[in-house]
Amino acid sequence: MRVLVVGGTGTLGRQIVRQAIDQGHTVVCLVRSLRKAAFLKEWGATIVGGNICKPETLSPALENIDAVIDASTARATDSLTIRQVDWEGKLNLIRAVQKAGIKKFVFFSILRAAEYPKVPLMDIKNCTEKFLAQTNLDYTILQLAGFMQGLIGQYAIPILDNQSVWQTGENTPIAYMNTQDVAKFAVRAVELDSVARKTYPVVGSRAWGATEIIQLCERMSGNNARISQVPMAVLRFMRSFTRFFQWTYNASDRLAFSEVLASGKALTADMAPVYEQFGLDPKETTTLESYLQEYFGRIIKKLKELDYEVNPTQTEGKKKKNNFFF
C-alpha cells in the first residue's frame, strides 16, 4: 500500500513512518522542510514538500496514494496558531484528500475532547471529528491521552539535573502510551477495512498521576525531586494576559490545556476490545515503568562513562554539573 504520512518529522509521525516501512508499505511524507526530513529519506521514505496551511501545495503529494495518516499538529515554537494548523490546515488536507479520490484517512484526536469546549485544542479536535463524520471518507479516528516521550522533559531530565519539577497540584491521571505503540495502531488502521468510519481510544494500560510519575522517577534515578507548585489561578491569569497579544495566542491556547490536566477526570479507557479489533497483542505494549527504566538505565550508564556525578549528595572532590541529555 502507498501511504502518505503528514507530519512525519514529529515525535509521533516519525514512528509511523518507521512502522509503515517495516510493515512493507511504500511511504511518502509531506513535510514543510526538506532539510529536516532528510533522515526519513534515509529510512526509505519519499519526501515531498508541502504545507497543509497552503492548500495549493497538497495535490502533488496525494498522487497515487492509497491512504493518508495525518500526524501533523501545531508546535509550541510555530509562528502559526493552533487554529491555523489544527483546524484550517486539517480542513485543507481533508478536502484535498477527498478531491484526490482517496478513501482511507487516519486522524488523531484527544480522549474526551467533547467535554472541554472552552479549551481550544480540545474543541478543535472535537469539531474535526464531527467534520470527518460528514465526509465520505473511510476515516479512522484514534483518540490519544498522552505520550511517554513527553515525560522525559517534564519529569526525568529535571530530576536527574536537580532542577525544579513544576506541578499544579494533583493532576489528572493520564494513560500515557509510547509513540511506537501508537504507530502500530495507526498503520493497522489503514490495513483494516473493519475500522473504517469508527473511533477508538488508543491509550496506555494504566493512568498515572503526576505524583506517581515523580515518585517513579525518583526511585529509578536515585535523586529526590525539587517540586515547585504553580497555582491554577496563576496559569489562568497568564492565559488571560497572553490573549491580549497576537504573538502570544499560541501560548495562551496551550495554557488553556492546563484546565484539562487539573480537572481530575482520568484520561483512560478500556483497551481490551481495541486490541482485539486491531489484532495487536497488549503484552507487547510498553509500560511506563519499563519505558522510564530503559531511559534512566541508558542515561545513568552514559553519565558514569563521562564521569559525571548523578547525585550531588555523594559528590567527593570536584563536582561536575550535568547538562547532557538526549
UniProtKB/Swiss-Prot annotation:
Taxonomically, the superkingdom here is Bacteria
Asked whether the keyword Thylakoid is assigned, the reply is: yes
The disruption phenotype is:
No visible growth phenotype except under high light (700 umols photons/m(2)/s) where cells become temporarily photoinhibited. Decreased synthesis of D1 (psbA), loss of RCII* assembly complex, considerable decrease in PSII intermediate assembly complexes.
Which Gene Ontology molecular-function terms are recorded? oxidoreductase activity
Name the keywords, alphabetized.
Membrane, Oxidoreductase, Photosynthesis, Photosystem II, Thylakoid
In the record, biological process GO terms are: photosynthesis
Extract the Pfam families matched here: NAD_binding_10
Function as written in the Swiss-Prot or TrEMBL entry: Requires HliD to bind pigments. The Ycf39-Hlip complex binds D1 at an early stage of PSII assembly along with Ycf48, ribosomes and ChlG, the last enzyme in chlorophyll biosynthesis; it may be involved in chlorophyll reuse and delivery to D1 in the initial stages of PSII assembly. The Ycf39-Hlip complex efficiently quenches chlorophyll fluorescence, contributing to photoprotection.
Complex formation: Purified in several chlorophyll- and carotenoid-containing complexes, including photosystem II (PSII) assembly intermediate complex RCII* (iD1, D1, D2, PsbE, PsbF, PsbI, Ycf39, Ycf48, HliC and HliD) and the Ycf39-Hlip complex (Ycf39, HliC, HliD and pigments). Tagged protein does not pull down mature PSII.
Family label: Belongs to the NmrA-type oxidoreductase family. Ycf39 subfamily.
The protein's name in its UniProt record: Photosystem II assembly factor Ycf39
Q: Which organism is it from?
A: Synechocystis sp. (strain ATCC 27184 / PCC 6803 / Kazusa)
